[in-house]
């Protein structure tokens, strides 16, 4: 069985990507192994849609892999997040666009873990989120094509990305090639440009193609020019 997703890729043309359900299960199990202790006893709530791979993996497949309850309703506003019952503890699956609009005047809910992906989370928004919820966000890096690649937990600005177990990155002439159990054995070349340190961790330094990200959405400059 497959789930079909669409992404702009590096060309700007919509590209259909068929994700085997078994691959989504495997990705969720990788995440469960990595985060299980910190997610113990949490309920999942989210401000991201499950129509995208990030929302599908973290909002649906991950809590299922851990046997944890998930909140079906979307959280669109800070007020909905603040209104969550204090009877439970929550894992909040969110995005930079939502976190930068948090209302710090509201009463914070008992969030045990914040996950953010889909785009870069500016440092000032990391600090703001931590100030309100008293916890630092876990940032996730990946793509629809590759699945999860890396994560970081920033308590200061310049923290690099760390790859997940079984994910390997190789600098080649055409770009950085990723090898992962979630994709074909020959690997995939990333659209992003990475700068590695001596320990194999990395920073994101830009993109190769004419596709930019604005509030977690891939925007094709080619498509805009053709309109």
Q: What are the functions of these language-model segments?
A:
Residues 162, 166-189, 197-199:
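Conserved beta-loop-beta connector loops within the AMP-binding
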């Amino acid at each position: 069985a497959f789930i079909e997703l669409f992404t702009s890729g590096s060309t700007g043309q919509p590209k259909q990507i068929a994700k085997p359900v078994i691959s989504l299960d495997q990705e969720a199990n990788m995440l469960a192994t990595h985060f299980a202790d910190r997610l113990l006893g949490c309920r999942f709530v989210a401000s991201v849609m499950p129509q995208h791979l990030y929302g599908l993996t973290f909002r649906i497949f991950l809590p299922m892999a851990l046997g944890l309850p998930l909140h079906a309703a979307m959280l669109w506003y800070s007020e909905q997040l603040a209104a969550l019952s204090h009877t439970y503890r929550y894992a909040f699956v969110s995005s930079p666009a939502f976190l930068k609009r948090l209302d710090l005047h509201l009463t914070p809910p008992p969030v045990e873990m914040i996950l953010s992906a889909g785009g870069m989370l500016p440092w000032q928004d990391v600090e703001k989120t931590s100030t309100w919820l008293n916890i630092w966000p876990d940032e996730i890096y990946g793509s629809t094509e590759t699945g999860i690649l890396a994560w970081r937990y920033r308590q200061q600005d310049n923290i690099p990305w760390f790859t997940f177990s079984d994910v390997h990155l190789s600098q080649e002439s055409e770009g950085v090639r990723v090898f992962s159990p979630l994709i074909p054995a020959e690997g995939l070349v990333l659209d992003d440009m990475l700068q590695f340190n001596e320990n194999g961790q990395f920073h994101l330094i830009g993109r190769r193609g004419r596709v930019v990200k604005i509030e977690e959405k891939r925007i094709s400059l080619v498509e805009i020019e053709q309109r």
